[in-house]
């Protein structure tokens, strides 16, 4: 497994110097650590660390999936420099322990979360090394700091899925359908002047992008909500940009190991959206979402509001591998194959997009489930929306 991961990096990573890392030397150190490992979890950790050393948001090791599903029952996000709980699942241990939206997370198992390391927490605790219990230091609005231990819900599943079996196949498809429902696009209208398009992912076909734009073309202002949108397909990004300009747009330059070429979004011409555009982003807006925001901002096509984006814009390809013949174990590697250099000669990787107007919710806003950012955007567009009502439009959805 380590050899396969190393070979993927060696042959496919966009930077032939591997960011100054001696890949062969690091691989030998990893081999020795694997020999001393006492569990599969330790082995996976060694392999993962080899890739984490690249400090590249899109270069990661994905270990074999676990048969047990782990659910922590609470969700957090960084706003500005602070991390807050944004959702707590009903009837979870987190709810029983008194954890609530708006609680500021000071430490997770002794480590202070921040904008730079939060994604690593998710990677370790969800994919690499799930924990049955998480120790939290939290601060509720108007209260003193406290420490709680939150137990995760662990659901044991099947270790082997036979997709030729009807029952197993149906269970697998239901799981995919549940994921799809969490990522539904939604358009909300406010009178004749303002529409909000909640876009959770860049997962639409070109025709679907056009259809969505056609629905909102009549409004004077479109608010495109890309908060918590981690990106997606380049095809979707290019078509979306093409719908907001009357000319072709050179987004930037794709820099690969052996070539460079421009990334161009072709205009949809007179069929696109010609009116006012407001884009909402936050610290979870990544990849295609922040590239879109950057283009809108640099071309002065609209206003970008919210929080600084995540700064995770490298282009990557996922390489799937398997071990075994009759009983197959799958694992994979995401390898960055290109960087995107913007027209100013810089990459958004690590820096992100700073909004034209920084708007951050407070702990009190999150506790009251108010969406002050969306309410401010609607008001700026000439509409009216109470923050409490705004908070009900796109609530956090838990997987069944």
Task: Say what each PLM segment does.
Residues 356-397:
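Low-complexity, Gly/Ser/Thr/Pro-rich intrinsically disordered linker/tail segments
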Residues 131-132, 137-326:
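Cleft-lining beta-strand/loop regions that shape enzyme active-site pockets
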Residues 66-107, 111-115, 204:
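PDZ/PDZ-like domain segments forming the peptide/carboxylate-binding groove
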Residues 111-122, 146:
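Short, Lys/Arg- and Gly-enriched loop/turn segments at beta-strand edges
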């Amino acid at each position: 497994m380590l050899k396969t991961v190393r070979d993927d990096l060696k042959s496919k990573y966009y930077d032939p110097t591997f960011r100054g890392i001696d890949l062969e030397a690091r691989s030998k150190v990893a081999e020795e650590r694997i020999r001393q490992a006492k569990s599969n979890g330790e082995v996976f950790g060694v392999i993962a660390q080899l890739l984490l050393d690249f400090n590249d948001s899109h270069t990661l090791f994905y270990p074999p999936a676990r048969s047990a599903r782990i659910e922590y029952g609470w969700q957090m996000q960084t706003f500005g420099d602070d991390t807050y709980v944004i959702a707590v699942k009903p009837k979870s241990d987190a709810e029983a322990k008194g954890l609530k939206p708006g609680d500021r997370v000071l430490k997770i198992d002794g480590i202070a979360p921040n904008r730079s390391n939060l994604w690593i927490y998710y990677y370790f605790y969800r994919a690499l090394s799930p924990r049955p219990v998480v120790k939290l230091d939290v601060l509720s609005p108007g209260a003193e700091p406290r420490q709680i231990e939150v137990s995760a819900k662990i659901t044991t599943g099947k270790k082997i899925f036979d997709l030729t079996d009807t029952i197993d196949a149906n269970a697998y498809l239901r799981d995919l359908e549940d994921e799809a429902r969490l990522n539904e696009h939604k358009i909300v209208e406010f009178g004749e002047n303002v529409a909000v398009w909640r876009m959770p992912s860049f997962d639409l076909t070109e025709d679907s992008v056009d259809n969505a734009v056609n629905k909102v073309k009549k409004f004077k202002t479109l608010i495109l909500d890309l908060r918590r949108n981690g990106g997606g397909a380049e095809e979707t990004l290019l078509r979306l940009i093409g719908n907001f300009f009357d000319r072709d747009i050179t987004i930037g330059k794709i820099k690969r190991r052996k070539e460079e070429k421009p990334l161009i979004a072709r205009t949809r011409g007179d069929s696109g959206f010609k009116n006012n555009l407001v884009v909402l982003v936050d610290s979870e807006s990544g990849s295609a979402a922040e590239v879109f925001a950057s283009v809108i901002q640099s071309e002065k096509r609209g206003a970008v509001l919210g929080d600084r984006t995540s700064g995770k814009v490298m282009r990557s390809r996922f390489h799937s591998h398997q071990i075994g013949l009759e009983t197959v174990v799958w694992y994979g590697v995401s390898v960055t194959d290109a960087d995107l250099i913007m027209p100013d000669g810089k990459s958004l990787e690590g820096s992100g997009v700073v909004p034209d107007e920084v708007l951050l919710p407070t702990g009190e806003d999150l506790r009251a489930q108010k969406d002050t950012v969306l309410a401010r955007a609607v008001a700026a567009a000439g509409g009216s929306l109470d923050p409490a009502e705004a908070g009900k439009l796109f609530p956090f959805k838990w997987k069944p």
